[in-house]
A protein has these predicted regions:
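Histidine-centered beta-alpha loop that forms part of the nucleotide-sugar donor binding/catalytic region
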Residues: 14, 75, 137-138
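Conserved alpha/beta core of the MobA/IspD/sugar-nucleotide pyrophosphorylase nucleotidyltransferase superfamily
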Residues: 2, 86, 171-235, 250, ...
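Short, high-confidence coil segments that cap the C-terminus of an alpha-helix
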Residues: 47, 100, 129-130
């Protein structure tokens, strides 16, 4: 791994999952979700190293087979209450090499991450246009919420002068597929959204997030439909021998504090 201007991709993949047991090892088009994430990152030309952080032996073995290094996550950072940020901070603490300039956080639950989208997002950060870039899908949805008394309240539109859907400016839904950020800014702010934040607009299959069996079935159907989703990897980097595992050391307890949102 280069010591200057390097880009590290991290795929958090816990062994536990309430929605779909063993979710990160479930397959789409014959490849596990964690393998698909690793292979997408390895096909991106601007990513130098890929690390999977996990508490599961089977996931660790799958990650190495896919070409990633592995950082073993301690139990206190692998529960439902642990945050994604805590997993990323633990990986950075565990590294024996100088820290990367740019950190790419990928979620295995997004099975159709396009390497070209990763490269474009990394370029925005490396070239100084943004401090953080994340995947988001356009939406023209009319959103509502309910008041304590059950009354429906319009959130993102005026219900009395409801415009045509096609006339509305799109809003954007965070897909969770990937986040690209300056490592220094992430360490300083301890969250992924810092400085100037930009969107990497994705749509269609690229916006899918696997949360339940129906999502998995949809992803499988898209994978089998010609031209609907990215196919199997063909890049020479994928399938090459795995890099040497990342050397780990005891992480600083002050830099890996869990936050409220659950980690993958």
């Amino acid at each position: 791994m280069r010591t200057t201007g390097s880009v590290l991709a991290v795929v958090p993949a816990r062994a536990g999952s309430k929605g779909i047991p063993g979710k990160n090892l479930r397959t789409v088009e014959g490849r596990s979700l964690v393998r698909r994430a690793v292979e997408s990152a390895r096909r991106a030309t601007r990513i130098d190293q890929v690390v999977v952080t996990t508490d599961g032996d089977a996931i660790a073995a799958e990650a190495v087979a896919a070409g990633a290094a592995v950082v073993r996550r301690p139990p206190e950072l692998a529960g439902d209450e642990a945050s994604s940020e805590s997993a990323l901070l633990h990986v950075l603490d565990a590294m024996s090499t100088p820290l990367p300039e740019v950190l790419v956080f990928l979620q295995a639950t997004s099975p159709f991450i396009d390497p070209a989208d990763l490269d474009a997002a990394v370029a925005r950060v490396v070239d100084g246009h943004a401090d953080a870039v994340f995947a988001a899908a356009p939406s023209h949805a009319f959103l509502w919420r309910t008041a304590p008394d059950g009354t429906a309240i319009a959130v993102n539109h005026d219900a009395a002068t409801r415009p045509r859907r096609q006339d509305r400016e799109p809003e954007y839904r965070e897909t969770g597929a990937f986040y690209v950020m300056r490592t220094a800014g992430f360490l300083e702010n301890r969250h992924r959204f810092h400085g100037r934040v930009e969107l990497a607009v994705v749509d269609g299959a690229g916006a899918i997030d696997i949360d339940d069996e129906a999502d998995l079935a949809l992803a499988e159907a898209l994978a089998e439909a010609p031209g609907e989703a990215p196919g199997a990897p063909t890049d020479a980097r994928v399938g090459a021998p795995a890099p040497a595992p990342t050397t780990t050391r005891d992480p600083s307890p002050t830099r890996a504090t869990p936050a409220p949102n659950g980690a993958p």
